[in-house]
Swiss-Prot record:
The glycine cleavage system is composed of four proteins: P, T, L and H. Gene3D superfamilies: Aminomethyltransferase beta-barrel domains, Aminomethyltransferase fragment, Probable tRNA modification gtpase trme, domain 1. Pfam families: GCV_T, GCV_T_C. Its EC number is 2.1.2.10. Belongs to the GcvT family. GO terms for biological process: glycine decarboxylation via glycine cleavage system. This is Aminomethyltransferase. GO terms for molecular function: aminomethyltransferase activity; transaminase activity. GO terms for cellular component: cytosol; glycine cleavage complex. Keywords: Aminotransferase, Transferase.
Amino acid sequence: MTQKTILNDTHRALGAKMVDFGGWDMPIHYGSQLDEHHQVRRDAGMFDVSHMTVVDLHGARVREFLRYLLANSVDKLKVSGKALYTCMLNPQGGVIDDLIVYYMTEDFFRLVVNAATREKDLQWIGEQAARFDVRVEERSDFAMIAVQGPGARTKVIDLLDPADTAAASKLGRFAALQTRSRDGIDLFLARTGYTGEDGFEIVLPQEAAVAFWNALLAQGVKPAGLGARDTLRLEAGMNLYGQDMDDGVTPYEAGLAWTIALDEGRDFIGRSVLEYQKAQGAPRQLIGVVMDEKGVLRHGQTVLTASGEGEILSGTFSPTLGKAIAFARVPAGSIEQLRVDIRGKQVPLRAVKFPFVRDGQAQPGVLGD
């Protein structure tokens, strides 16, 4: 049974091409994926991300629970509304999901987890939470809209209750606040995103989502679909769960070493495997690659290295760069001489640092200059 977000009819009325995405009927584009991509890089676009799962955790021991559940350290979260990106691991160090955790109060934290992993995540979190007496509450009453781009914040702030505009303007990156729109809609406003641009991800009651979406349209925010979301996030060097990492891949093998907090001696699920890989080195590595020849890099293509074979993970044609870019997982070792097998032809690749694009501009070295 395909699920629909509260905005489904709204997307169709706007001419969206709808596709199945992890069991959800979602817009891939509203006419031109390319235009939507550039709209976000240059001004502001909005995405329906109501398929994402919001999970509220309540209890006196919720911080202690999250110190055990997550590979990054919630002890970094000391101010209400502050957020942290982290992986949730299995005992083998594999990534069950990547998520954002928000500190609300000492007995209330909020998680935003991926749509495709919802059932698995809820079961795992529930199993681990039981001995900490933490109550796990899925918030299916919420919708979620991401407004992204250099003009995004101004356009959203114009819709807020005037009493809250100053606080919203000062909100730092990876922080959130509870606010209201001019029309009295309760909004959880987070300065986060999945595009590499500034902006907000807004959690709000389902029954208010259509009205707020239409208010954003009136502000000149253009709708954007999952197609543009994918090219934007890959340019920004952001992983997609299920494609760039999964239960059989550790954060060290997924370019996510920066999300691991080993230094404080905290015991968390998967720690022993990560300690071993940090000391001995992980057997595989995730790298960014650019193909200067014409063509497109696709998931599953074989990558040839001096140390053995790897594969393309996320791959796309980058609208900002005008070249094919990708993540690849390859054996540990040299990444000097790289080639990709495209229908039997070996095509050279360049390994580059990611993000490929920051603030709408190619990062140094990405274009080969």
